[in-house]
């Protein structure tokens, strides 16, 4: 009798343990079996929709985060040295560049500390690719290069800090009213424009940019922060550039139908899709890709997939940014 009771207890404990295991497994399903969900902790999602970090999960058929859990966060300077930064933006301090002396390595590193996920998400290759993508897109926005420029057109990023041929860019909004005498034209690496964007950005980084928009063109740390704010911030229906380039964004069925897939091309769509995407071959898109490829090569990382947006439907026609290339 005692033996039977003991066997029943062992059997009951075993059943409960199995149920706990099954229940825990169901809580960690991912991929197409779970509506595109990502695994917690950066773990791989296997072809069958389960989370883990071994070859069974991260190997052939892996659906997402296939590099496994991210390494511990590190200072950005461990991924991009001062000398590499100077090589990437080789002619930014050329005498012909109005931004000479403004965009410094130290300002870039200091600004990035306000956004600890930037360059710190995913495996080392993903982190480097994000840095290349950010500098590639912003180099296009501030380029001073031309087809036959010394060292090629993609060595002339960060030549400008202010938009050429600027306008006022003031739209009457009660939440972010234009300050008297101020203009909200494109400034900084991402060429942020319009009063409501200066207002949102200033609120996020703790600076009164509505009343002092020119801080984006006179304080190099604030200037980089403005670009990183845009990069890291989702503005519905657009995801953040950060989430797209690090594959944390899962496209909806509407995105897939619009050919908006994870990759550098969708970042271009976020930034200036209304003018550049869905138009077939476009020299502006090619320019963005040229910078990106050069920077990936210097960082020793692959380009990833979906580099252009030639066949993508734009997210929308409202523009956050003022593109230097189109304003010439």
UniProtKB/Swiss-Prot annotation:
Listed SMART domains: ChtBD1
Propiece residues: 318-328
Keywords tagged on the record: Carbohydrate metabolism, Chitin degradation, Chitin-binding, Disulfide bond, Glycosidase, Hydrolase, Plant defense, Polysaccharide degradation, Signal, Vacuole
EC class: hydrolase
UniProt similarity note: Belongs to the glycosyl hydrolase 19 family. Chitinase class I subfamily.
Swiss-Prot/TrEMBL induction comment: By ethylene.
Domain Chitin-binding type-1: 28-68
Record field: catalytic activity: Random endo-hydrolysis of N-acetyl-beta-D-glucosaminide (1->4)-beta-linkages in chitin and chitodextrins
InterPro entries: Chitin-bd_1, Chitin-binding_1_CS, Endochitinase-like_sf, Glyco_hydro_19, Glyco_hydro_19_cat, Lysozyme-like_dom_sf
Active-site residues, as the UniProt record annotates them: 141
Protein's GO biological process: cell wall macromolecule catabolic process; chitin catabolic process; defense response to fungus; polysaccharide catabolic process
Organism for this UniProt entry: Phaseolus vulgaris
Subcellular location(s) per record: Vacuole
Cysteines paired by S-S bonds: 30-45, 39-51, 44-58, 62-66, 97-159, 170-178, 277-309
Pfam families the UniProt entry points to: Chitin_bind_1 (PF00187), Glyco_hydro_19 (PF00182)
UniProt GO MF annotations: chitin binding; endochitinase activity
Any single GO CC term annotated in Swiss-Prot or TrEMBL for this entry: vacuole
Coiled-coil segments: none
Gene3D superfamilies tied to this protein: 1.10.530.10, Endochitinase, domain 2, Endochitinase-like
Main location: other
Protein name as annotated: Endochitinase
Secretion signal span: 1-27
EC assignment: 3.2.1.14
